[in-house]
Amino acid sequence: MLSIRRHAKTVASSCTNLTQKRTYVDVYMKWKRDPYFDNIEHILRSSQLKSVVSLKNCIVQEPNRCIPISAISKKTRQFDVSTKIAHFLRKFPSIFEEFVGPEYNLPWFRLTPEATELDRQERVVYQTSADDLRDRLKKLILMSKDNVLPLSIVQGMKWYLGLPDDYLQFPDMNLDSSFRFVDMEDGVKGLAVDYNGGDKVLSVLQKNAMKKRRGEVSLEEIEFPLFPSKGCRLRVKIEDWLMEFQKLPYVSPYDDYSCLDPSSDIAEKRVVGFLHELLCLFVEHSAERKKLLCLKKHFGLPQKVHKAFERHPQIFYLSMKNKTCTAILREPYRDKASVETHPVLGVRKKYIQLMKNSELILKSRRNSFGFRDEGVVDKDLDLDFEG
């Protein structure tokens, strides 16, 4: 039977047995562009897809599954769209179909048959993967300081965790009895998980180490899998530091960390372990780096937590595409068997394919001189609603 030698989160005093020293090396490794990670399509299009799915959900919630542009034209911030809503919808004719409304010839939108079918498939995935999605949310909360997170944090992580937009609106259906809505300080509403100390929660790194060794694993045996970019060579000093870092005891993100010296090497390894586990929970195993900064207070992260990505480029990759910095966990892409594929990823890839089909449709329209599709409203008709 597999087991792992590690203190439970409820036993805070045991971590005092760890030797907490600080041998800080000012690691600076020149950022090296990696075309493979810069061109992972579902990461590149994730932000735009999020807006597409949010608008899709807004439309299907309507009684007739269609909506006038006037009802959503002022909600660019809600849907995280930087252009006019109508312009954004028209960019994806394979997903959103425009037609003349019942009154005043105003533009309305509904889903195309292809998008409607994909929406159905998406709902099936949510139903069949309900336990998986709930466990991912539970693990996120169990990594927090007191097993509780503000609802605003949970809401902000929904897309990354693969949860539906309305997930928290139906707690009786989506959450089990271990979840509780609580009042936090300053009147903030939170979501807590009651952990009874029964089955120990193991990180992906712990599970993989146990599988590899087929038995009990000590803390010193758990190392981070490294996946350097091609042509990347480290200076001897940095290589020596990295070897020593790997030998440090592993502190699971689900274990108590209150007695760790924040300036110790072990504390840094704990932060890297937290980021590794966090990205393992996410659909694309990636996230905009700035979106993770709000987690510092609730997960005991240092002020300069973003430096962890820079100090460990063989574990994480920072992509600068789309004028933003995206942190990507290398392991799931270089060793596909190491991390389970998120159940929602397949559906998102299908939405992205529809987005790509839209580009072909628009290109075909541009190439057809004088082409005008009947039923498509003149773009000027919605200007009054887009001001």
From Swiss-Prot:
Q: Offer a single GO CC term for the protein.
A: mitochondrion
Which terms does the record give in the GO molecular function aspect? RNA binding
Subcellular location(s): the record lists:
Mitochondrion
InterPro entries linked to this entry: PORR_domain, PORR_fam
The record places domain PORR at 32-358
Report the principal subcellular site. Answer: mitochondrion
What is the name attached to this protein's record? Protein WHAT'S THIS FACTOR 9, mitochondrial
Q: What is the lineage of its organism?
A: Eukaryota, Viridiplantae, Streptophyta, Embryophyta, Tracheophyta
Give the encoding gene's name.
WTF9
